[in-house]
């Protein structure tokens, strides 16, 4: 297969940041996707529908002319989120979900939920109104090994949560382990998962063998190859519980190449080509459209896109860097390497 035409894909998990960063991040994402779930972990975080709509306007100001990119907004779940805010999400045309970060789990997550039992009143409303709860699925206890944090979250947080709220709509975001994949498979249709390009294409050897490579460092961290293999199997299976979410996360070069470097891979500029490469490597390119263009929209109860994109099989050199912020650079995932697919 030398070319493939898909319904325009969507990104169900992306970080755009705010302010000057939007000049870089919004056009990069808008050239790839029709819609994106825009993460709320700004400083300060996006905690109300009003704040989300204001952030959406800031994003729209940077969409290239002639592009119909539609940012879909998310609220940041805190210990102080009001149950009434859930009703406002349900009534909003542009806000689709609420994101729960365990406090301290990732970039700008210090305002996150300290104990999920404290917010059961809000979760009750999420279940009633069928508003999706998006989860960064890791525990954050210092004594838990970083490679075990996802599995511990499933056992200690998510399993009890779904027993208490069996109809809750949940997206377990950026899954990285066989444990998470099998957990999602065992649940009803109200539980789904997103998978990033880096967790399909790479594993912890890519990050750690032959020197530490900071551009593979993200959270949840890359796992061993056996987990990567399982993620590829479920992503390419045609099961609608698994769909595209890049978790594209911009950090300037000096924040990544650092004694204490930031977590996140910037995949937005070549995201769909990265996924195409992953699917093609296992001979499942025909399954890409469902994963990228159908299943996420279906889960969120939104119409599928009607426009299409075409990918052709030809060498596609990923740029070494892009301009970012004031006189800084951002290094994309797979910088300086050649992909086998190009979006035309």
Curated annotation (Swiss-Prot):
Residues at which Zn(2+) 2 binds: 99, 136, 174
The keyword Hydrolase is assigned to this record: yes
Reaction(s) the record says it catalyses: (S)-dihydroorotate + H2O = N-carbamoyl-L-aspartate + H(+)
Binding site for substrate: 15-17, 41, 136, 219, 251, 263
Domain of life where this protein originates: Bacteria
Obligatory cofactor(s): Zn(2+)
Modified residues (N6-carboxylysine): 99
GO biological process: 'de novo' pyrimidine nucleobase biosynthetic process; 'de novo' UMP biosynthetic process
Residues where Zn(2+) 1 binds: 13, 15, 99, 247
CC annotations in GO: cytosol
Keywords: Hydrolase, Metal-binding, Pyrimidine biosynthesis, Zinc
Cofactor, free-text remark: Binds 2 Zn(2+) ions per subunit.
Pathway membership: Pyrimidine metabolism; UMP biosynthesis via de novo pathway; (S)-dihydroorotate from bicarbonate: step 3/3
Keyword field contains Metal-binding: yes
Active site residues according to the UniProt entry: 247
E.C. number(s) listed in UniProt: 3.5.2.3
GO molecular function terms attached to this record: dihydroorotase activity; zinc ion binding
PROSITE patterns in the cross-refs: DIHYDROOROTASE_1, DIHYDROOROTASE_2
Enzyme class per UniProt: hydrolase
Subunit structure: Homodimer.
Biological role stated in the UniProt entry: Catalyzes the reversible cyclization of carbamoyl aspartate to dihydroorotate.
HAMAP family given in the database record: PyrC_classII
Family: Belongs to the metallo-dependent hydrolases superfamily. DHOase family. Class II DHOase subfamily.
Protein name per UniProt: Dihydroorotase
Native organism: Acinetobacter baumannii (strain SDF)
């Amino acid at each position: 297969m030398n070319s493939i035409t898909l319904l325009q894909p969507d990104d169900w998990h992306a970080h755009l940041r705010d302010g000057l960063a939007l000049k870089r991040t919004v056009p990069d994402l808008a050239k790839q996707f029709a819609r994106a779930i825009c993460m709320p972990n700004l400083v300060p975080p996006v905690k109300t529908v009003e704040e989300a709509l204001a952030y959406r306007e800031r994003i729209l100001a940077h969409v290239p002319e002639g592009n119909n990119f539609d940012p879909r907004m998310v609220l940041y779940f805190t210990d102080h989120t009001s149950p009434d805010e859930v009703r406002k999400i349900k009534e909003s045309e542009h806000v689709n979900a609420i994101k729960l970060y365990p406090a301290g789990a990732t970039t700008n997550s210090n305002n996150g939920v300290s104990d999920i039992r404290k917010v059961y009143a809000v979760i009750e409303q999420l279940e009633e109104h069928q508003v999706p709860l998006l989860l960064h699925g890791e525990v954050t206890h210092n004594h838990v090994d970083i490679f075990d944090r996802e599995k511990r979250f499933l056992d200690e947080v998510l399993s009890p949560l779904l027993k208490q709220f069996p109809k809750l709509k949940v997206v377990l975001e950026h899954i990285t382990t066989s444990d998470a994949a099998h957990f999602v498979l065992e649940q009803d249709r109200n539980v789904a998962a997103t998978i990033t390009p880096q967790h399909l294409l790479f594993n912890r050897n890519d990050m750690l063998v032959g020197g530490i490579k900071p551009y593979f460092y993200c959270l949840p961290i890359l796992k061993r190859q056996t987990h990567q293999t399982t993620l590829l199997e479920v992503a390419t299976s045609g099961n609608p519980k698994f769909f595209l979410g890049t978790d594209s996360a911009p950090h300037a070069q000096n924040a990544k190449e650092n004694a204490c470097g930031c977590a996140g891979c910037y995949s937005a500029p070549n995201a769909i080509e990265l996924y195409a490469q992953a699917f093609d490597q296992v001979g499942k390119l025909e399954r890409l459209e469902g994963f990228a263009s159908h299943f996420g929209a279906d889960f969120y109860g939104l119409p599928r896109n009607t426009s299409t994109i075409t990918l052709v099989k030809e060498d596609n050199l990923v740029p070494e860097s892009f301009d970012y912020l004031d006189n800084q650079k951002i290094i994309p995932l797979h910088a300086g390497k050649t992909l086998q697919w190009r979006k035309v």
